[in-house]
Amino acid sequence: MNEDTLFLACTRPATFAGVTMEGMALNVMATSILFILTSNFTMIGLGIGLHFVLREVTKYDHNQFRVLFAWLNTRGKQKNLTRWGGGSTSPLRLIRTYKELNR
C-alpha cells in the first residue's frame, strides 16, 4: 500500500497547512470559543500553537480524526454500554473466550 503513491495521493484527505479539515474544524471552534469567552487576542496565538500540535498528531496517520469521530459516533454515544458489553446493541450474549464457546 505504501508503494502505490498514486493511490495514496488520490485518497489523502484535504489539508490546511498539514492538518486535516476535521482537525481544523476543532481548532477553529476551540479558538473561537476561547476568544469570545476571554476577549483576549492571545487566544489566537493559542490557536496557532494548537495547530502545530494537531499537525504533529496527523503527521504519520492522516485519518486520526476520522477514526476518533467514527468511535464517537458508534461507541461514544452508547448510553447502555455496560449492559451490553460492547459498542453495538445485540440481544445475543457476547462470547469473549474459547471456553465460553464450548459451554
Swiss-Prot record:
UniProt function note: Component of the type IV secretion system VirB/VirD4 which could be a major virulence determinant for subversion of human endothelial cell (HEC) function. VirB3 may play a role in stabilization of pilus structure.
Subunit structure: Interacts with the 17 kDa antigen protein that is encoded within the VirB locus.
Name this protein carries in UniProt: Type IV secretion system protein virB3
Keyword Transport on entry: yes
Transmembrane segments: 33-53
Pfam families on file: VirB3
Family the entry assigns: Belongs to the virB3 family.
Subcellular location per the Swiss-Prot or TrEMBL entry: Cell outer membrane
Disulfide bonds: none
Recorded GO CC terms: cell outer membrane
UniProt source species: Bartonella quintana (strain Toulouse) (Rochalimaea quintana)
